Amino acid sequence: MDTFQVIILALIQGLTEFLPISSSAHLILPAQLLDWQDQGLSFDVAVNTGSLLAVVMYFRKELYSMFMAWTGSIASGKQTQESKLSWWIILATIPAVIVGFTAKGFIETYLRNIEVIAATTIIFGLLLWWADRMQRQGFNEFQVGWKKALVIGLAQAMALIPGTSRSGATITAALMLGLSREAAARFSFLMSVPVSLGAAILVTKDLLSSGQAIDYQALGLGIVVSFIAAYVCIHYFLKIISKMGMTPFVIYRLVLGAVLCGFIFL
């Protein structure tokens, strides 16, 4: 990959990773429009690491409080709202881990194609619109409980289907369960930490065992660009949804889905 490709693809990944619009739907566009080849494992390591660092940096205070409360609850047996939230995040991660390990080959072989991505982009966009429209109660993330956490975790596992969008699926589920827009987004972002960490570790392991030459320039540039893009994205996304809701992202998904359908049928 040349420098231009690294910057463009890292920007796309960073900007779309935490928006409910599907990063895979966007990463397929350069391949369709510009005939770019697969990004390679070095790039995958870079964008996973950059996205992880962005969400950890943005929520560093919350994550520190949660970690300290969680370790304290193990030692003392006493639960606080931060320790409960930590346990719910762990619980919500389990379905994606199970599905990821058992169905990764099937997903990569049969579902990573433009037809599936176009369909899921549109379908889950409509589900996001419906969930946002029906949202009324406005619970915060400290009121999730283990049952809601498990349901949101199942939605995250479903998001392994390309085009679904991890943040889109989890925010949709959280809104359906009565969380406020901001709480749904925060819970989704916090859920991304163990998932992104696991993904970064697995892709790094694949890279080291593949025997591929490591492109350190692409690796470093991809981390920096995806980190900056993801950090900015998180900050402004939380501001946008508090004022405008999910409608702009729903419209965008429908337009994007239509564009992808155009590549299929035209």
From Swiss-Prot:
CC annotations in GO: plasma membrane
Q: Which reaction does it catalyse?
A: di-trans,octa-cis-undecaprenyl diphosphate + H2O = di-trans,octa-cis-undecaprenyl phosphate + phosphate + H(+)
- TM region(s), chain numbering: 1-21, 39-59, 87-107, 111-131, 144-164, 183-203, 218-238, 246-266
What are the EC numbers?
A: 3.6.1.27
Tell me the GO BP annotations in alphabetical order.
cell wall organization; peptidoglycan biosynthetic process; regulation of cell shape; response to antibiotic
- Location in or out of the cell: Cell inner membrane
Please name one Pfam family that this protein belongs to.
BacA
- Asked whether the UniProt record includes Membrane among its keywords, one would answer yes
Q: Which UniProt keywords apply?
A: Antibiotic resistance, Cell inner membrane, Cell membrane, Cell shape, Cell wall biogenesis/degradation, Hydrolase, Membrane, Peptidoglycan synthesis, Transmembrane, Transmembrane helix
What else is noted?
Answer: Bacitracin is thought to be involved in the inhibition of peptidoglycan synthesis by sequestering undecaprenyl diphosphate, thereby reducing the pool of lipid carrier available.
- In Swiss-Prot or TrEMBL terms, this protein is called Undecaprenyl-diphosphatase
Cited function: Catalyzes the dephosphorylation of undecaprenyl diphosphate (UPP). Confers resistance to bacitracin.
How this chain sits in the membrane, per its record, is: Multi-pass membrane protein
- Chief location bin: membrane
GO molecular function, one example?
Answer: undecaprenyl-diphosphatase activity
Q: Which family does it belong to?
A: Belongs to the UppP family.
Q: Which NCBIfam families match?
A: PRK00281.2-4 (NF001393), undec_PP_bacA (TIGR00753)
Query: Sorted alphabetically, which PANTHER family does this protein's record hold?
Result: UNDECAPRENYL-DIPHOSPHATASE
